Amino acid sequence: MIDLYLSPSCTSCRKARAWLQSHKVPFVEHNILTQPMTTNDLRHILTKTENGTEDIISTRSKVFQKLAVDVDNLTINELLDLVTEFPNLLRRPIITDSKHLQIGFNEDEIRAFLPREYRRAEMLSTID
């Protein structure tokens, strides 16, 4: 099952939700502002990142700039607590399943969440 972590006002989040719905991909939606991610959720996501916290923290966010925190000097537990308290620190949307992780919306990369049969059929239809 796909988990879509988003905030409703985020344009990229709305695009990701619309894309998943239009391709009839089942997913569970999590509003990170009303239901902040647990530290276990965050740890699970971090295990799938290539660059660790750098991939999930939005350094351009107003919250990040206002807090003026040097995330490189925080322990992982301190960082997880901070993100739990301030979910707007996260880049959004976060889309994950048992194998894949996508942070942000990219129409080409999100195709990884389509079932293989769907992608194969779609590819064959473009050849005909």
Swiss-Prot record:
- Look up the record and give one Gene Ontology term from the biological process aspect: negative regulation of DNA-templated transcription
Q: What does this protein do?
A: Global transcriptional regulator that plays a key role in stress response and exerts either positive or negative regulation of genes. Acts by interacting with the C-terminal domain of the alpha subunit of the RNA polymerase (RNAP). This interaction can enhance binding of RNAP to the promoter region of target genes and stimulate their transcription, or block interaction of RNAP with activator.
One Pfam family of this chain: ArsC
Q: Which Gene3D superfamilies match?
A: Glutaredoxin (3.40.30.10)
Q: Which CDD domains match?
A: ArsC_Spx
User: Subunit composition?
Assistant: Interacts with the C-terminal domain of the alpha subunit of the RNAP.
Q: Which GO terms describe its cellular component?
A: cytoplasm
Domain of life of the native organism = Bacteria
Q: Which gene encodes it?
A: spx1
What protein name is recorded for this chain? Global transcriptional regulator Spx 1
Q: Where are the transmembrane segments?
A: none
Taxonomic source organism: Lactococcus lactis subsp. lactis (strain IL1403) (Streptococcus lactis)
Q: Which cysteines are joined by disulfide bonds?
A: 10-13
Protein family: Belongs to the ArsC family. Spx subfamily.
Keywords, in A-Z order: Cytoplasm, Disulfide bond, Redox-active center, Transcription, Transcription regulation
Which locations, inside or outside the cell, does it occupy? Cytoplasm
